[in-house]
Amino acid sequence: MTKKLALKRRGKDSEPTNEVVASSEASENEEEEEDLLQAVKDPGEDSTDDEGIDQEYHSDSSEELQFESDEEGNYLGRKQSSSAEEDEESSDEEDNEEEESTDGEEVEDEEKDSKSKQTDDKPSGSGAASKKALTAELPKRDSSKPEYQDSDTSDEEDIRNTVGNIPMHWYDEYKHIGYDWDAKKIIKPPQGDQIDEFLRKIEDPDFWRTVKDPLTGQDVRLTDEDIALIKRIVSGRIPNKDHEEYEPWIEWFTSEVEKMPIKNVPDHKRSFLPSVSEKKRVSRMVHALKMGWMKTTEEVEREKQAKRGPKFYMLWETDTSREHMRRIHDPVSAPKRDLPGHAESYNPPPEYLFDAKETKEWLKLKDEPHKRKLHFMPQKFKSLREVPAYSRYLRERFLRCLDLYLCPRAKRVKLNIDAEYLIPKLPSPRDLQPFPTVESMVYRGHTDLVRSVSVEPKGEYLVSGSDDKTVKIWEIATGRCIRTIETDEVVRCVAWCPNPKLSIIAVATGNRLLLVNPKVGDKVLVKKTDDLLAEAPSQDVIESERIKTAVQWSNAEADEQEKGVRVVITHFKPIRQVTWHGRGDYLATVMPEGANRSALIHQLSKRRSQIPFSKSKGLIQFVLFHPVKPCFFVATQHNIRIYDLVKQELVKKLLTNSKWISGMSIHPKGDNLLVSTYDKKMLWFDLDLSTKPYQTMRLHRNAVRSVAFHLRYPLFASGSDDQAVIVSHGMVYNDLLQNPLIVPLKKLQTHEKRDEFGVLDVNWHPVQPWVFSTGADSTIRLYT
């Protein structure tokens, strides 16, 4: 009976706090486990200890029995618990019958247990010896191995990582992943490669429901309840499946408003009788009316109206009143005048006094005084008593009064913008090479200013026209003058035919246009050109009198034939400019004094001329052919018009906002136009973007005479009266959404100034990144 009660108490009250779970290897050690179980059941055979199955173990014992092996100890615990359960089932009836009779015995057993517990605390007790013997028989675990190395199941949930709520990637560089309750490192489980991952995907049917625990690095299999919970959260439903979303509403409080009086006291008797105080007040008011002391409302209003008098309303009364209130509550003080500077002193420093050039510029702006930097001219006196009266004093005081009286005042928030922020970020010129940087050659031979220059399509020869009435043909590589053609008048413009199959130079001198065969280069090409210009083709079209009076075609005379002149086109006014079409069959001339016949188009193959315009819309300064489309650019003094030669209509009108246009150059692709003006500006037009300039460049100090695009490289150049040739980078992208990139690269200033003239014309080499410039110093310079 005592044995059964002890087992019962052991199963209910004194369960061990540290449970050991059996591993899968218990079946391999059955013999050792049976011996160990036999030793526990028959303690008399293995030890002299008075402990047995009746002995009760408590967790607070200083020398508590501990199992060193998970397998054997857990097996022993399972055997004992199963035997205890069998004893309990077999002796339930006996325990119920003898429960009352054994109360005394239980007390005695407890006393014995306490005595045996005291004896167990002693090191010389037999219980300690039996524990040591039992511990020695159990195999010890290797502490160097990770606790979950032998099993990849999730049964070792008692292992806890104590690192806390920290990012686990902090342990990526270490072999362990944290620390357990004994402050021992938790070694990371072995990680497979991609092949292992692929095999697990194929072989493991539960791979899709396996997740990795970031605290321990183990693979955790999700249960059906976990998956159902995840599905409910993903679908946006309540995680708890037992929750009823549409359960019936219970009205804990009524929704009907019940109106009930706070108090239901019956009215007093005096509420039905007239008020005595009101009766006295009315009697006093009646007496005041009889005596004339009190006036009616109409009489009071009439007296107020008489005091106010007639009232007149302003048409904008609301606005004036609002402005009046604003001035009262938020007044804006008048701006103070600028304090006088050193330039206004009666004895200013010498650097503040005007020199001859500054005085001339100041006097030149007499009609536009607002453009002057100073409204007066600084003067110097020896003493203060020599300073005369200020002649502009009354006028300046009067203008100051007008500003204070008439100019509206308003507060403006000043924007503090860094100047560097407004400057666009441009690439370095070193990254945009090649471009001309130095002067390589000077062509000398003319005796007067050189007005025009043109290059052969192959880039071997150069032609120039000068005011000394000569046309010179140069060899570019050596700088040698090959041929000189003398004319009767000043040569205004020369242009080499862009067709490489012909060798023709158009020379504009006076009112004659000469078509010259330079007799340089390929002899076959020279002969072919002579054959083309030898005889005039038959005319199938009858020319009008308007064209006949404007232009006449004729063959050159014998003396001119020896010089190379083949055809002479005589105009009725002096020619200023000549330009070729890209194919080399058409050329156009400009006569600024020709009114509505200022621009003429000539066809070389048929020796026929046309007047494209019947009315004059300004003085034509420059004309140009489109390189791709049948369009004709006509520049007047202020605007540029683009005409379609096929449809014979105006396509677009470009607004330059300049005083006088000097020249034009079109990009080889035909979508961008560069314009030079006499008011120191260069205008870049994007023909697909707008009719206004895309960018205005003020790179020169004087009038810009000429501009030119390179045929192959993204370069353009400009020449000005400040003796400078400025080379710039002009990249045009195929992407229409990307704006052109314009970067000034190099300023080449080697020409000399003559009679306020500098560089008159610029032109590019057709193949190399070289630029030619002509100047008033009668030289032609090559920059490479």
Curated annotation (Swiss-Prot):
Intracellular or extracellular location(s): Nucleus, Nucleolus; Nucleus, Nucleoplasm
Record carries keyword Repeat: yes
GO terms under cellular component: nucleoplasm; PeBoW complex; preribosome, large subunit precursor
Biological process (GO), any one: maturation of LSU-rRNA from tricistronic rRNA transcript (SSU-rRNA, 5.8S rRNA, LSU-rRNA)
Intervals holding WD repeats: 445-486, 488-526, 570-612, 615-653, 656-695, 699-738, 754-784
CDD domains given in the database record: WD40
Compositionally biased region (Basic residues): 1-11
Ranges annotated as biased composition (Acidic residues): 27-36, 45-54, 62-73, 84-111, 149-158
Keyword annotations from UniProtKB, A to Z: Nucleus, Repeat, Ribosome biogenesis, rRNA processing, WD repeat
InterPro entries: BOP1/Erb1, BOP1_N_dom, WD40/YVTN_repeat-like_dom_sf, WD40_repeat_CS, WD40_repeat_dom_sf, WD40_rpt
Region (Disordered): 1-159
Record GO terms (molecular function): ribonucleoprotein complex binding
Biased composition (Basic and acidic residues): 112-123, 138-148
Described function: Required for maturation of ribosomal RNAs and formation of the large ribosomal subunit.
Similarity remark: Belongs to the WD repeat BOP1/ERB1 family.
Protein name (Swiss-Prot/TrEMBL): Ribosome biogenesis protein BOP1 homolog
Organism: Drosophila melanogaster
